[in-house]
Amino acid sequence: MGFTEETVRFRLDDTDKQEISKTLTSVYRSLEEKGYNPINQIIGYVLSGDPAYIPRYNDARNQIRKHERDEIIEELVRYYLKGNGIDL
């Protein structure tokens, strides 16, 4: 499969964004409760796709796997940009 020169559009609907936000918050808390560095663990999962970065504790692993990693990245970028004054 080759790459195209045309720009491809990617969009999430608002319901997906809210679900991803809830999931990330829940997973963060579960990681924190288990004594992990939540940021490092979530980054490890998002970059590698390896669910072993997220514990089964509080069903965190199953929760985060319900979302595609690219959708998680989109929500993280959107949240960061909004927090830095960018109107989206």
UniProtKB/Swiss-Prot annotation:
Query: A single Pfam family, by name?
Result: IreB
At the top level, the lineage of the source is: Bacteria
InterPro entries with a match to the protein in the record:
IreB
Q: Which family does it belong to?
A: Belongs to the UPF0297 family.
PANTHER family attached to this UniProt entry: UPF0297 PROTEIN YRZL
Query: What protein name does the entry list?
Result: UPF0297 protein SSU05_0066
What is the originating organism of this protein? Answer: Streptococcus suis (strain 05ZYH33)
